[in-house]
Amino acid sequence: MLVISNVYPSNLFTLINPFFAKLPEAYAIFDPIVDVMPIIPVFFFLLAFVWQAAVSFR
């Protein structure tokens, strides 16, 4: 496995750290949407608490 990871050292950094990954140029207009997408599950988690508060935590 060590040999395989050393074959492409320039791509290894982007595979380990996805925060620095870039979208292809054709999809650059979707970059702001892609930045917000990981937060969407947190909104559903918070919505569950709001929903339970609305029904008095039954």
Curated annotation (Swiss-Prot):
Give GO BP annotations, semicolon-separated.
Answer: photosynthesis
A Pfam family per the record = PsbK
Q: Name one GO cellular component term.
A: photosystem II reaction center
Residue ranges of the propeptide: 1-21
Primary place of residence? plastid
Q: Does the keyword Metal-binding apply?
A: no
Any transmembrane segments, and where? 29-49
InterPro entries, A to Z: PSII_PsbK, PSII_PsbK_sf
Q: How does it sit in the membrane?
A: Single-pass membrane protein
What superkingdom does the record give? Eukaryota
Q: Which UniProt keywords apply?
A: Chloroplast, Membrane, Photosynthesis, Photosystem II, Plastid, Reaction center, Thylakoid, Transmembrane, Transmembrane helix
Compartments where located = Plastid, Chloroplast thylakoid membrane
This protein's assembly is summarised as: PSII is composed of 1 copy each of membrane proteins PsbA, PsbB, PsbC, PsbD, PsbE, PsbF, PsbH, PsbI, PsbJ, PsbK, PsbL, PsbM, PsbT, PsbX, PsbY, PsbZ, Psb30/Ycf12, at least 3 peripheral proteins of the oxygen-evolving complex and a large number of cofactors. It forms dimeric complexes.
NCBIfam families, per the entry: PRK02553.1 (NF002715)
Q: Provide the family line.
A: Belongs to the PsbK family.
Q: What does this protein do?
A: One of the components of the core complex of photosystem II (PSII). PSII is a light-driven water:plastoquinone oxidoreductase that uses light energy to abstract electrons from H(2)O, generating O(2) and a proton gradient subsequently used for ATP formation. It consists of a core antenna complex that captures photons, and an electron transfer chain that converts photonic excitation into a charge separation.
The name this protein carries in UniProt is Photosystem II reaction center protein K
Organism whose genome encodes this protein: Psilotum nudum
